[in-house]
Amino acid sequence: MRLAYWMYEGTAHHGVGRIANSMRNVHAVFHAPQGDDYVNAIFAMLDRTPNFPAMTTSVVSGTDLARGTIRLPDTLRQVEERVHPDLIVVVASCSTILLQENLEIAAQHAGLQCEVMVYDANPYRMQEIVAAESLFTDLVKRFAKPQPRTERPTVNILGPASLGFHARHDLISLRRMLKTLGLEVNVVAPWGASIADLRRLPAAWLTIAPYRELGLRAAIYLEEQFGVPALLDAPIGVQPTLRWIERLRELLAQAGADVPMPPLTAFSLDGMSAPSAVPWFARTADMDSFSGKPAFVFGDATHVVGVTRFLRDELGMPIAGAGTYVKHQADWVREQLTGYVDEVLVTDEFQVVADRIAALRPELVCGTQMERHTSRRYDLNCMVISPPTHIENHLLAYRPFLGFDGADVIADEVYTTCTLGMEKHLIDLFGDAGLDLPEKTERTPVAEPAPVAATVESPQPQNEPAIAVASAPSLTSAPATPTPAAVVDPVWAADAEAMLKKVPFFVRGRVRGNVEKYARQRGHAVITAEVLLAAKEELGA
């Protein structure tokens, strides 16, 4: 555990909350100080469900610590009386774990009728993804019992969960494809599953676990312990979906079920046309221009691999770079992206990713909410393809990422993300003639930076641009010969900004980056029109 400005994953008890909030008649109780109940607000804001989050905070206060008392037994009794759950999962937050209290004994003193599970989610060893995956796997191991196989072929779907990225939409897409194949769903878990449903998991003929982050270990356990074969691929894209369907039919055939392949039109929404428009749309003039637009992809393991392959294999876009923050899946990502990128960026520090994006200046960034902020800073196109996300990525409408429907959704996102903004380019070229737009407020000229001595005693803040200047040059004349002893992050003068606006928007970011690089190499603290012209002359742009 570490303090961070932004984090790609939530804390361990956040992951526990995702599992409890996904399941029916399961409730999480957090042994935590008042400040750690922010998790409840996150679920209430983002999850878009009519129910209150299935979690309660048993508050630990300074008074309790001074008196040597603990409120947990009373809280557990109140939860049982109010909610009547089948299972209560008790977990300490990242703050109270430091107290090293024995929550097992405290839970026993509550004298509950329902089952209680004290889960050791140590934030010094795990974060959201590992905590959620480990808890779900433990629940499957605890409750899954040997069952006779269902009469007709059925499948389990493991992985969709509360606050999952488009998880409910993916579930609809998977159900549609399975129904087209004539297959029934045995259990979906953790989303909507009860403890009784977990007991029925071994009755299925096959387990589908499309996400590397959640459901993978449980699917492997069911295969090893009960002989239920597992399909662990994610059908992201048209060709991967076709291969996924074929693999599903092969596994069921090995289990003794013959699943005939219906015509492809049966998978479409109208039942008459092709299941996806991507194959022909990728060959149109609209998409032909995308073949030269480099993309950078970053996020969780599942979506990074799926989207990277989709962009290059089906849309013809070159991949400038790819990476993931899920470190325990890094080797799998490297294996899957062999031949797509020379190196996979593995980091959970958003500033490292931001620096890579700034260096590459791709035409399209596919990432998380953090990459959206970074792209806005550098005026780059960005689409969100992975958690963490904000409210706009928890949609009410049907927007899956898996299956044929998901391929169309991703292609639409790529197309609209890269082409919207053309009106901005036209306004840059022709002004607002005929548009009746209000006059744009003139930018306030950038003031000359005050001289700052670069000393060890006065370091610059890590997340703020550092300006180290011996003496601020005039904004109207080209700076003198560089003094590269101190690295600078140059400031743009008003005349240079005005000149930069004349550059077409789709290459403006790259020009800005090249000019700033030129200025840094020569020690220019302020980029004036003269500096910009000098950079243009030297770079030949």
Swiss-Prot record:
Keyword 4Fe-4S: yes
GO terms, molecular function: 4 iron, 4 sulfur cluster binding; ATP binding; metal ion binding; oxidoreductase activity, acting on iron-sulfur proteins as donors; oxidoreductase activity, acting on the CH-CH group of donors, iron-sulfur protein as acceptor
InterPro entries: ChlB/BchB/BchZ, LI-POR_suB-like_C, Nase/OxRdtase_comp1, P-CP_red_C, Protochl_reductB, Protochlorophyllide_Rdtase
Residue positions binding [4Fe-4S] cluster: D36
Superkingdom of origin organism: Bacteria
Cofactor: [4Fe-4S] cluster
Annotated substrate binding sites: G421, M422
Pathway as given in its UniProt record: Porphyrin-containing compound metabolism; bacteriochlorophyll biosynthesis (light-independent)
The protein's Enzyme Commission number: 1.3.7.7
SUPFAM superfamilies to which the protein is assigned, alphabetical: Helical backbone' metal receptor
Coiled coil: none
Catalytic site positions: D286 (proton donor)
Cofactor note: Binds 1 [4Fe-4S] cluster per heterodimer. The cluster is bound at the heterodimer interface by residues from both subunits.
Pfam name, any one: Oxidored_nitro
Catalytic activity reported: chlorophyllide a + oxidized 2[4Fe-4S]-[ferredoxin] + 2 ADP + 2 phosphate = protochlorophyllide a + reduced 2[4Fe-4S]-[ferredoxin] + 2 ATP + 2 H2O
GO biological process terms, semicolon-separated: light-independent bacteriochlorophyll biosynthetic process; photosynthesis, dark reaction
Keywords: 4Fe-4S, ATP-binding, Bacteriochlorophyll biosynthesis, Chlorophyll biosynthesis, Iron, Iron-sulfur, Metal-binding, Nucleotide-binding, Oxidoreductase, Photosynthesis
Function: Component of the dark-operative protochlorophyllide reductase (DPOR) that uses Mg-ATP and reduced ferredoxin to reduce ring D of protochlorophyllide (Pchlide) to form chlorophyllide a (Chlide). This reaction is light-independent. The NB-protein (BchN-BchB) is the catalytic component of the complex.
Family of the protein in this entry: Belongs to the ChlB/BchB/BchZ family.
The protein's assembly and partners: Protochlorophyllide reductase is composed of three subunits; BchL, BchN and BchB. Forms a heterotetramer of two BchB and two BchN subunits.
HAMAP family hit by this protein: ChlB_BchB (MF_00353)
Name of the featured protein: Light-independent protochlorophyllide reductase subunit B
Organism from which the protein derives: Chloroflexus aurantiacus (strain ATCC 29366 / DSM 635 / J-10-fl)
Phylogenetic classification of the source organism: Bacteria, Bacillati, Chloroflexota, Chloroflexia, Chloroflexales
